[in-house]
Amino acid sequence: WEPVPGTDKYYFHMFAKEQPDLNWENPTLRKKLYDMINWWLEKGLAGFRIDAIINIKKDLDFPNLEPDGADGLAGCWRMVENVEGVGEYLEDLKKNTFEKYDAFTVAEVFNMHKDELSQFIGENGHFSTIFDFSAHALSNGAHGWYDAPDINFNDWRKTIINSQLQVQKC
C-alpha cells in the first residue's frame, strides 16, 4: 500500500509503486482500457504482451492476512490466489479488443492448474498463447522463490515435456 500525497488515502500496488493496481470492478475503467487498446490496434499494432493479467481480480474485502515472512508481512499474492471471476474480465477484454482485430496476444499467467489451460489458450481461450511458467514453479519453496529448492534436471525436463503435451491438446 502506498499513501496518496496530501490525502489520508492509499493505493494498492503488487509491483512497483509507480504501477498502481487498477480497479477492474469499475466498468468505466474497463471501457477506458479497452479504448486505449483499440486505439493502438486501429493504428495497426498486431498484438500485445500482457503481464500479470491474472492479478486483475482481487479480494476486495482486503482481509488482514497472517504474516508469512520473516519481515512480518503477508505476501500480496494471497489477495489474488483464490478469487473467482477473473475469466469473465479476460473474456470481456478479448471480445471488446483483441478479437475484433484478430490480434496476437501472449499473456503472463501463473499458478494455473493444467485443467484450466484451455480457458486461456486454444480456439476459445482468452489469449493466443501464454508464457509457460511450469518449470519456474519447480523453484517455488514455501515462500516462493525466497527459499527456492534446488532443481533436478530430470524433473525440469519432465515438466517441460508435460507442459508441451498439454498445450498440444488445446
Q: Can you say where each PLM-predicted feature lies in the sequence?
A:
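Short, well-ordered alpha-helical packing segments
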Residues: 34-41, 87-94, 164
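A structural signal for short, well-ordered beta-strand segments and their strand-loop junctions
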Residues: 47-52, 104-108
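Conserved alpha/beta catalytic core and glycan-binding cleft of carbohydrate-active enzymes
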Residues: 90, 94-170
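Soluble or luminal CAZymes and related metallo-dependent hydrolases
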Residues: 25-32, 81-89, 151-155
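Alpha-helix-loop-beta-strand connector modules within alpha/beta enzyme cores
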Residues: 63-103
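Substrate-binding/active-site clefts of carbohydrate-active enzymes
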Residues: 1-43, 47, 53-78, 114-116, ...
